[in-house]
Swiss-Prot record:
PANTHER family: L-AMINO ACID N-ACETYLTRANSFERASE (PTHR43617), MYCOTHIOL ACETYLTRANSFERASE (PTHR43617:SF31). 1D-myo-inositol 2-(L-cysteinylamino)-2-deoxy-alpha-D-glucopyranoside binds at residues 33, 176, 218, 231, 269. This is Mycothiol acetyltransferase. Residues 1-156, 149-299 form the N-acetyltransferase domain. It is an enzyme of class 2 (transferase). Acetyl-CoA 2 binds at residues 235-237, 242-248, 274-279. Its EC number is 2.3.1.189. GO terms for biological process: mycothiol biosynthetic process. InterPro entries: Acyl_CoA_acyltransferase (IPR016181), GNAT_dom (IPR000182), MshD_Acetyltransferase (IPR050276), Mycothiol_AcTrfase (IPR017813). It comes from Rhodococcus erythropolis (strain PR4 / NBRC 100887). SUPFAM superfamilies: Acyl-CoA N-acyltransferases (Nat) (SSF55729). Gene3D superfamilies: 3.40.630.30.
Amino acid sequence: MGWTDSLPAGSAEQVSALLDRATEFDGKAPVSEQGRHAVAGRGAARHFVELDGDTVVGYAQLQAGSDEHPDMAELVVDPQARRRGIGTRLAAAVFDEGRPGTRVWAHGNVDAAVEFAKSLDLVSVRELLQLRRPLDAPQLPEIVVPEGVTMRTYRGPEDDSEILRVNNAAFSWHPEQGGWTQAEIDERTAEGWFDPAGLFMAFADTDPDTLLGFHWTKVHAPEGDDPELGEVYVVGIDPAAQGRGLGRVLTLAGMHYLRDRGLGTVLLYVEGDNTAALHTYERLGFDRFHVDMAYARAL
């Protein structure tokens, strides 16, 4: 099966089952949340399926980039079909289909992924860190809202336009988080994990209709050896409101909410080269848990 813009229902079910098997076997998901949405037909992507007879044994997904951002790919091989050259064929298909500079994610960047990248003469070009922190100890700092700022939680679709404005201004540089449309908000508010009480928003007292920043939390269902986990899902600050401590206070508001829901651990993702954010999160007690690495062909 060659590249396709959408998966037939039967293939999508097989790919989803393959992702589940690989997640259970490896202890980590081989594709992102965005990738899962695309498999289910809720996001634009190109799909490539490797078959053994009628059985899906390999899968690659290619997300188109832009003039500023490269194409991004994810791939997975059935745990029972590895070391047969399937991964090499999937990677070749990705680099043949993608634009120059296409990148492939290695979620967890385990030794096998590092060796696989070396065998294809790929180089690491982007590092995404997952940080974690227990919510019970050390004690969370108190929430101190800056003077002249009001915080509240999500009220519904009436808030969406401001969330989109701030998100896209704050993440204009980001290949996945930037460029959101209403569809991205609708997908997430329709998810079973969404709780409007866990989406925190900050406004100036003098301008209560203009959003300064937001923190969208998420709760992950138990998976593998992991219990239910909280996540600092998105923290977005309007560039015009930077430097007022809003990122810290919004992050803490979400962490207090997750703790009060009875969760024991919170996670977040941050770019490996974002030293300012890393410093902020480390001061809040976060430690590095694992690394996702993106690889590309050497120039």
